[in-house]
From Swiss-Prot:
Protein name, UniProt field: 1-acylglycerol-3-phosphate O-acyltransferase ICT1
Keyword annotations: Acyltransferase, Lipid biosynthesis, Lipid metabolism, Phospholipid biosynthesis, Phospholipid metabolism, Stress response, Transferase
SUPFAM superfamilies reported in the protein's UniProt record: alpha/beta-Hydrolases (SSF53474)
Superkingdom per UniProt: Eukaryota
UniProt motif HXXXXD motif: location: 374-379
Domain notes from UniProt: The HXXXXD motif is essential for acyltransferase activity and may constitute the binding site for the phosphate moiety of the glycerol-3-phosphate.
GO BP of this protein: cardiolipin acyl-chain remodeling; lipid homeostasis; phosphatidic acid biosynthetic process
Domain AB hydrolase-1: 74-381
More info: The isooctane tolerance of organic-solvent tolerant strain KK-21 may result from the alteration of the expression of several genes including ICT1, due to the loss of their proper regulation.
A Pfam family per the record: Abhydrolase_1
Reactions performed catalytically: a 1-acyl-sn-glycero-3-phosphate + an acyl-CoA = a 1,2-diacyl-sn-glycero-3-phosphate + CoA
Source organism (scientific name): Saccharomyces cerevisiae (strain ATCC 204508 / S288c) (Baker's yeast)
Lineage, highest ranks first: Eukaryota, Fungi, Dikarya, Ascomycota, Saccharomycotina
Amino acid sequence: MWTNTFKWCSKTEKETTTADAKVCASVQGLKALQQQIMDSTTVRGSVNNTMTPGGINQWHFHNKRANKVCTPTVLIHGYAASSMAFYRTFENLSDNIKDLYAIDLPANGASEAPALQVNKTKKIKSLRFKHIEDDVVIPVIEKRPPAEDIKSHLEQYESYFVDRIEQWRKDNKLRKINVVGHSFGGYISFKYALKYPDSIEKLCLISPLGVENSIHAITHKWEPNTTYPLTFTDPSSRYYTRKLNVPRFIFENQLNVLKWMGPIGSKLCSNYISTAYVKVPDQIYKDYLLHSFVGKNQTVQPQTIKVFTHLFERNLIARDPIINNVRFLNPATPVMFMYGEHDWMDKYAGYLTTESMLKNKAKASYVEVPDAGHNLFLDNPQHFASSLVSFLSK
């Protein structure tokens, strides 16, 4: 792992391997593309782009006149995204937050991609069962190890991101921080709050992945050859599941599949971006996404894919879901769940989790952003920023 990307990238060609040179070129390319977006973005106060000693690419917005939110606040992007996902909110947020940070997670965007080091353990196998109409039979074969062993194994993968977020906080010499995480970044942010409760002031989970309870949750015990009733509508139930699974080949290879398809993959990706980001007016951001998804500057590195495929099932349900762990959060930490009005993520799961926390006297709230989908900060940046600042400033 190199400690300073600019210094590392300044090595002569003889001093780097071919693989290193490709990674370096990718980092430089993504940083250049990010700079193009930032050059067209209005912010309040100063903006500074640096690589931390821990290898995190960060954008720091400092506005000494902002007085609504004085606690340093970090924005953590979702899967196959980067710090630029929040670019449409930078103006409004930097107007109200004294110190705002947007970072690229490790092995994402222009951040370094350190090796993923985990103890050699047999890969966790998905629960195998058989559907009988609306019921399910849990078979005897391949019984799972104890839940504690699985959880310990999963935590090794979570720590790849969680521990580096904590190191990022220390590198910036910050005390308590507000953490705002979207989708996969919301799941990681939640796990960060569990592991480092003293580092968190407030936690905002934006359309987080991995909230739902399910038959796949590692804490559930099942009797072999026993029939259980399934539910496809109650994401708080241990009997919950989803019918659709991502094909295994696509799940395990993800964006690489598009790259392997050549021009056809690029065309499919371009069509997807045009449809999914129809509310985003700036072509420069859409071009950035295309480069990130299928270009030589692909934002998602193998480490991220490996972590993702260990933490989640092929139906995108978490093996250690948020709803089953909220009781372990510091009850004094305010938490807000935020979704888009037309979000494809399971809003009901977030609502039920909020209700559960409130019943247990925790500080929780639930908000929906109108006229917005899963990327609510891109679809309705003004309302998103207003809701976030309102939560953080209370």
